[in-house]
């Protein structure tokens, strides 16, 4: 369960067939189908690690040339009111109703001792969002200068048109689709496994990311414990809602902009590969998408 929290945090973020082609690049060129000039697709990772900024030759040239910068959420138009309202569980649920007394004590002690926070402050918050605090702390990930933020700031400096391929409510609703009971289990697992699995998973994920090995990233995303029905259910929800549905939305919404002018699209790397990944969805629309 915890590894899915890691993926949500980093790719924020498929059980589809991978097929014969190897997705071995983070950087893809989109052309053909009447486009006047090429656009570009880049798989990001929400990380400050220096390695994610070691771009392949041509990435920054493509970024600098692009007239439009497209990301998952346009930071200029994030709806804070919608965000805050969606963080709250309905009136019949709270952490105390979802956790056993022992589980509540474990989580409460962890928040007090490791995070310096009182758990009652998060009593009505959806557990998955609370889990993000644990996962981010475990990975020592501070969100200020992560790769996606870096691209956004550079786009603003260059006065590019910046657009979001998703709406705040859509991303929040994806989280809300996970039953509270599964969210609560994920929170307890994250606390119990703090400092044990996260570092190993992150090292492996970073290795595949730096290699541009999207196939392996996709494989990590689809893994689940077959003996844990909750983990299997979480994996299916992650696949259907966090990836497939969002992939279709982003591919459709990107199309008017790549027709308008050269667009640099930067989205989580997990959204690129697979039969229903953005690469294949754009190809099905008639575009030529090749690794650069």
Where are the predicted features?
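Bacterial Sec-dependent N-terminal signal peptides
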Residues: 1-28
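Short, glycine/serine-rich, charged loops/turns that create anion-binding
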Residues: 12, 46, 270-271
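A conditional alpha-helix N-cap/helix-loop micro-motif detector
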Residues: 20, 52, 144, 243-247
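Residues that act as N-cap/strand-start positions at coil-to-secondary-structure junctions
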Residues: 22-24, 149, 248
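Structured, acidic catalytic/metal-binding patches in enzyme active sites
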Residues: 29-233, 238
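A cross-kingdom marker for long, charged
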Residues: 232, 236-292
